[in-house]
Amino acid sequence: LSQPVSKYDSDLISEFTEAMATGILDNYIKRTFGKASEFSESLEETQLHSLTTELSLSIYRASAGRKVGEFKKNSIEDIGDTIDFLLYDNIKLEGRFYECVSDFGSYKLLGAGKEFISYLLHIRDPSLFGMWNGSAEKSLKLLGWDTVNLKKGPWGIRYIDLLDMSYRIQSRFRLADLRSVDQFNHWVVRFSPISQINKII
């Protein structure tokens, strides 16, 4: 991993490390990742046939899904088919992401958007796949990154752009993996000094 490129970065790293030590993110981490290992095991290709509606709802809620009523309208068969396609089909990642997120996609589930789909990818492999939620975009903006490409074009290409920026945040701020990037983003948006300054402005 690269060294901090400035005192600004170094200070943010120190402040984030100190914040983690205080437990300020414990509730968020428990809510979002407390059952990540269990979820990941249930999403293994050989286990998908055992996926239940209750478990799929738990995964949806952990991803911060807010349209529970809509999501409940999906059959467990459709949910399983979408997960199987997303995680195990041979077409490129951007194609799979598009088909699961776009309103025109063949595997779009009711109530499920980029947050749920990126969460599924992430819990299967947090070293490769980042989470695309509100904090991810807001954090990038607070850190001064250009996020215009996240607002236009095919969904799959947008996710690839989000991943690229997530990898760069991981390297720049010396974070362990993309799960740490998500926690860092959450902290930046809600608790960091730059978020407080932004609120004042």
For the regions a protein language model found, what residue spans apply to each?
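An N-terminal alpha-helical hairpin/helix-loop-helix interaction module that forms a charged
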Residues: 1-110, 125-201
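Contiguous, well-ordered alpha-helical segments that form the cores/surfaces of helical PPI scaffolds
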Residues: 117-124
